[in-house]
Amino acid sequence: MPEIITPIITPFTKDNRIDKEKLKIHAENLIRKGIDKLFVNGTTGLGPSLSPEEKLENLKAVYDVTNKIIFQVGGLNLDDAIRLAKLSKDFDIVGIASYAPYYYPRMSEKHLVKYFKTLCEVSPHPVYLYNYPTATGKDIDAKVAKEIGCFTGVKDTIENIIHTLDYKRLNPNMLVYSGSDMLIATVASTGLDGNVAAGSNYLPEVTVTIKKLAMERKIDEALKLQFLHDEVIEASRIFGSLSSNYVLTKYFQGYDLGYPRPPIFPLDDEEERQLIKKVEGIRAKLVELKILKE
């Protein structure tokens, strides 16, 4: 059964600290509304901006709510990633994950393979690849993943479904998740294992229903809902999706997630107003379809 995994937003206070209470409220709501797992410290959670201590703080807070967690530990200091992986032994979670070391250009494939194999060697949990070429500048594709040989699963954040399907073709025992919100109906229809969908932070009901309809082979209904979801995603990108996520969660779910962390700045009042104006018609349609409540 395909899963919907939420790369959970990290709420910050005005003075730039993690707001653990808001994080727990958000995690509780997501699990209650049918989200299968939470991906902690991902891009949507502003993971690259978090210190190792903050990454662990996020894990502890979410673990108070659920153990259905994939704990993202990656970064530019391998010692930090190793330490976080080892510390995760105290938590009965699904697994750890890491993106490729980013920023540094022209890293050899040999060194990238060594990075991930080192994490696999020390991890007390299954290890998931977080492949996000646009953000990291490195594509740990299906062939490289097979060479590394120790991944339980992959989150492939790329719009090309063939690229994602290749992981399953070359690594048939690997759990393969698309990182694209716009491919939920497609993924549920192809035999892949689900989506890690940023939009499920603010529209968990929609993402879960798209998956359900696609699994029931109600493809027309699934696509109708998928296209409404896509419109919200596209609206968020106009103003910067990482900042928009905070506004949209408050609008659709009714609770405040505080602030993002600069250089991901909060939207100003006018940007918020314009964003809400772009999605309020979609919300009305979702209410009419009885996906959302009034």
Swiss-Prot record:
Site annotation Proton shuttle: residues: 130
Pathway annotation: Carbohydrate acid metabolism; 2-dehydro-3-deoxy-D-gluconate degradation; D-glyceraldehyde 3-phosphate and pyruvate from 2-dehydro-3-deoxy-D-gluconate: step 2/2
InterPro entries for the chain: Aldolase_TIM, DapA-like, ED_pathway_aldolase
Keyword DNA-binding listed: no
EC number in record: 4.1.2.55
Binding site for substrate: 43-44, 130-132, 155-157
Record-linked Pfam families: DHDPS (PF00701)
SMART domains according to UniProt: DHDPS (SM01130)
Activity's thermal dependence: Extremely thermostable.
An example molecular function term from Gene Ontology annotations: 2-dehydro-3-deoxy-6-phosphogalactonate aldolase activity
Catalyzed reactions: 2-dehydro-3-deoxy-6-phospho-D-gluconate = D-glyceraldehyde 3-phosphate + pyruvate; 2-dehydro-3-deoxy-6-phospho-D-galactonate = D-glyceraldehyde 3-phosphate + pyruvate
Gene3D superfamilies on file: Aldolase class I (3.20.20.70)
The protein's role, per its UniProt record: Involved in the degradation of glucose and galactose via the Entner-Doudoroff pathway. Catalyzes the reversible cleavage of 2-keto-3-deoxy-6-phosphogluconate (KDPG) and 2-keto-3-deoxygluconate (KDG) forming pyruvate and glyceraldehyde 3-phosphate or glyceraldehyde, respectively. It is also able to catalyze the reversible cleavage of 2-keto-3-deoxy-6-phosphogalactonate (KDPGal) and 2-keto-3-deoxygalactonate (KDGal). It is equally active with both D- and L-glyceraldehyde.
Oligomeric form and interacting partners: Homotetramer; dimer of dimers.
Entry similarity comment: Belongs to the DapA family. KDPG aldolase subfamily.
NCBIfam families per UniProt: Arch_KDGaldase
Protein name: 2-dehydro-3-deoxy-phosphogluconate/2-dehydro-3-deoxy-6-phosphogalactonate aldolase
Source species of the chain: Saccharolobus solfataricus (Sulfolobus solfataricus)
